[in-house]
Amino acid sequence: IRTTLQFLTTTRNSQRDIVVFLLSVKSGLRAKEIASITWQMVTDPEGNIGDAIALQNVASKGKNGGRTIPLNRDLKAALEILKEFAVAKRLEKGFPFDLTSNVITSERGGRMSANSIAHWFKRLYGNLGFDGCSSHSGRRTAITRWAKNTSRVGGSLKDVQDLAGHSSLATTQRYIQSDTEAKRKLVDCG
């Protein structure tokens, strides 16, 4: 994650790019969700970046994909900076900032499609030499990390399922990557 974030500080749209990556790896969002998220979904009633993503069904997969995902502190900080840029850009063009506008926009200010987000990830991982990675890799990383930390924070796999927006725990379990070292430690602790 650190290597990717370091690389993203060098891109032309670095703040947007950092937010795209963090939405995937820290919030476990799908490409479609990243493309569809609006400022309204990440702000509080006063218009400040809130403490959670209130992902609506329209932005998610299926009619029951809406969910609330607490904001990781790094993602929250990145969203605050990106929002400052977005507000300034709108005002520069003579338009008021609109909370219903998309968080992630193209260089020209238009909405990015899920396909564009998927291609963005493909280019990113290709530039970094990460073969076999896709727009879903960050989501898998987030879900695996949540699962590994669940018992430490007093949660359950049901919490991971809810964060991931899966209707079935079996689907969530398919995302969780096995760890040989963790298996060894589990056997040794009992």
Regions found by a protein language model. Give the residues of each.
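Phosphate-coordinating loops and pocket residues in cytosolic domains that bind phosphorylated ligands
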Residues: 6, 36, 44, 174-177, ...
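Short basic/aromatic active-site micro-motif
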Residues: 16, 131-149
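C-terminal catalytic core of tyrosine-transesterase DNA break-rejoin enzymes
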Residues: 26, 141-166, 174
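Conserved tyrosine-mediated DNA breakage-rejoining catalytic core shared by Y-recombinases
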Residues: 36-75
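Catalytic-site neighborhood detector that most strongly recognizes the C-terminal catalytic loop/helix
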Residues: 59-61, 164-166, 170-189
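C-terminal catalytic core of Y-nucleophile DNA break-rejoin enzymes
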Residues: 60-80, 98-122
